[in-house]
Curated annotation (Swiss-Prot):
InterPro entries: Cyt_P450, Cyt_P450_CS, Cyt_P450_E_grp-I, Cyt_P450_sf, Insect_CytP450_Detox. It is found in: Endoplasmic reticulum membrane; Microsome membrane. This is Probable cytochrome P450 309a1. PANTHER family: CYTOCHROME P450, CYTOCHROME P450 28A5-RELATED. It comes from Drosophila melanogaster. The lineage of its organism: Eukaryota, Metazoa, Ecdysozoa, Arthropoda, Hexapoda.
Length: 506
């Protein structure tokens, strides 16, 4: 019996030793290359919270490392589980990686998330999850439907959504009072705008009963939530990538894939049958691509790429911006004055005007900075290159090594943005956003050739909603909402965002 117990203990010890050796095999990787390794370094890597604490955002673990080393080094060696990764502490180096040396860092870590399940085809059809020449082709196809000239022709879609938004607020005020949960309101607006722009349909999110959530909005909410949780789940499997194949892990669920396939097929058939003929929107672009040889599945992949940016991230920025303005009455009044002055001449704001209202732009950029919907950007070294570590030291990087650009940390660094936690739109006056981006300090959409392709759509959605709300209502904060982790990807308002909408006297 004692022999059996001893044998079992030996097996346990050996198994533990094997696991420990497997997890820590690379932990001298950065030391051997003359790069400081972030401490503490556990068997779970530099960011153990990603594996052991569901309620702790990866952003917080990165923040701890950033705070400890940012004043000492341009970059520091870290590990996501056992995967070696550089954390870029110097924004100037971030600009170099994202822009100047883009050809050496062309691919993203998300491109390694696909291909493990052949049925997960729509995520594989997104440039966000693609690499190499495939990324270049998919991005080119996608961007063609999002050019400024095309959005200008489609601007009436956003204007109509803005009018529906005001009508919905009025119905909500009559039925439930002036206090409206604004997170829900924001996503109702972005659901309506994206359904109309991408598929040419009325989602019913603003025209249905107050508080009722239709199939499109519900499916979009479930789909985007699953997409962000998949990001974290796939990051966790960096410790053992074979797990993805073993369990045929999917990024999007089968149910949502089927929903958006049916929706896209029906939309294409309706348009080709004469409904909405001559309309300039994203659906017309998808049909043009199909006429050149794209399949319906290619169209679904492109549609979902735009939808993720236009629905989820735009909605998040919108309710955060309204929350900030509700707390800062002076800034809200200044922005309202600018909007009303622009409205005075024509009765509505044109596409060109909405993109040339300086204070609206400042408030939008400050909201992007505070929210930072994409907290970090990960790039893969695709060609051998050398980076300057400072103090006459350089580092030779090999293909396959990943780097993290921590946009959230730059945006909330008091050395870059004094009183960084405060809402101060004046930070972005006189074209400061462009200057800060070139310094690598302002990266809400990333930078370089892989900059977020839904950037213009998101900007148009948020600005249009703000114009329609502030030209009709005074928005007041009813209670403080704490910040908290959300899907591990960022730090967002955690709880109901209840704001009071008081009709302006005209």
């Amino acid at each position: 019996m004692f022999t059996l117990v001893g044998l079992c203990l030996t097996i346990v010890h050996v198994a533990f030793a094997v696991v420990y050796f497997y997890l820590t095999w690379y932990h001298k990787y950065w030391d051997k290359r003359g790069v400081v390794t972030a401490e503490p370094l556990t068997i779970l890597g530099s960011y153990p919270g990603i594996l052991i604490n569901k309620s702790r955002s990866l952003i917080l673990d990165v923040q701890d490392v950033y705070n400890k080393y940012k004043d000492k080094y341009r970059t520091v060696g870290t590990f996501i589980t056992r995967q070696p990764q550089l954390l870029v502490l110097d924004p100037a180096l971030a600009h170099e990686i994202l822009v100047d040396k883009f050809s050496h860092f062309r691919d993203t870590i998300t491109s390694s998330f696909v291909g493990h399940n052949p049925d997960d085809k729509y995520v594989a059809g997104s440039p966000f999850f693609s690499a190499g020449d495939k990324w270049k082709r998919l991005r080119s196809e996608n961007v063609g439907g999002l050019t400024p000239s095309r959005l200008k022709m489609a601007y009436s879609i956003w204007e109509q959504s803005g009018r529906k938004l005001v009508e919905y607020i009025e119905r909500a005020r009559r039925e439930q009072g002036d206090i409206i949960e604004t997170r829900d309101l924001a996503y109702r607006f972005t659901a309506n705008a994206m359904a109309d722009f991408i598929w040419g349909i009325d989602a019913g999110s603003l025209s249905g009963k107050v508080g009722e959530i239709g199939d499109f909005q519900k499916t979009s909410t479930d789909w985007s939530a699953h997409a962000f949780s998949s990001m974290i789940r796939f990051n966790k499997t960096l410790v053992a990538i074979f797990v993805r194949k073993l369990f045929s892990m999917r990024f999007f669920t089968k149910a949502t894939d089927e929903f958006f396939l049916r929706l896209t097929q029906d939309a294409v058939n309706l348009r080709q049958g004469g409904s909405g003929e001559g309309r300039t929107d994203y659906l017309s672009h998808l049909i043009q691509l199909q006429q050149r040889g794209n399949s319906i599945h290619d169209s679904v992949g492109h549609a979902l790429t735009v939808h993720l940016d236009g629905f989820e991230t735009s909605g998040a920025v919108l309710y955060h911006m309204l929350y900030s303005l509700s707390e800062h009455h002076e800034e809200q009044e200044k922005l309202r004055s600018e909007i009303l002055e622009a409205l005075a001449s024509e009765g509505q704001i044109s596409y060109d005007q909405i993109n040339n209202l300086p204070y609206l732009d400042q408030c939008f950029n400050e909201s992007l900075r505070l929210t930072t919907p994409i907290g970090f950007f990960m790039r893969i070294c695709t060609k051998p290159t050398q980076i300057n570590l400072g103090d006459d030291k350089t580092l030779d990087l090999e293909p396959g090594v990943t780097v993290m650009v921590p946009a959230y940390q730059y945006h909330h660094d008091n050395d870059i943005y004094p009183e960084a936690s405060e809402f101060r739109p004046d930070r972005f006056e006189n074209g400061a956003a462009s200057v800060l981006t070139k310094r690598g300090c302002f990266l809400p959409f990333g930078d370089g050739p892989r900059i977020c392709l839904g950037m213009r759509v998101g900007q148009l959605s948020v600005k249009t909603a703000i114009v329609h709300i502030l030209s009709n209502y005074q928005v007041e904060q009813m209670k403080k909402v704490p910040l908290g982790a959300d899907s591990g990807m960022g730090i967002f308002l955690n709880g109901d965002v209840e704001l009071k909408y008081t009709k302006l006297q005209k």
